[in-house]
Amino acid sequence: MFYISKDNPCYYFTSVTNNRLPVFRTDKLKEITCNAISEARKSSEILIFAYVIMPDHFHIITDGKLKPSNILRYLNGVTARRVIDYLKENNFTSSLDKLKQFEKKRGYKYSLWEHHSDTFTITSESMFMQKVNYIHLNPIRAELVGNMDDYLYSSARIWKRKLLENEPLEMDIGKIKWRET
């Protein structure tokens, strides 16, 4: 079980695409991102409590077993590899051109993510729920849906116990041991 406390924090991450490009406009790329997050989750053994994938960024809350920099490295590294591989395999050259970054030693490489991702340490259940609600309201604020349950690439349904048969990403909310009532 996971207790949220100062000694055992969670982390709230926001990763933004390079130049805020709307890379995740299509369901296919959101699905690839969910699969990549799931892969990172398993390989790094992190717990994921909430998420949303927006057109140009994602928010996610994880446990604090690893250092935040390592969690972010796993999440952003695996998602970048999977998304860029998909774009290459399907000849999305104009999208790849927008993600090119020049490196002196190696020439061009691709950079999916901005290099200043936002990390926030969560040390209380009330702060945790504030971030969960913020994440779930994101698609409404962006006018992508009218009801948070209608946005497929979010954990909102899971938190409301309205799971779909094939949720895009598994959550670990059952592993939270709540202290406050």
Describe the residue ranges of each PLM region.
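Short catalytic/metal-binding and nucleic-acid-binding patches
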Residues: 1-181
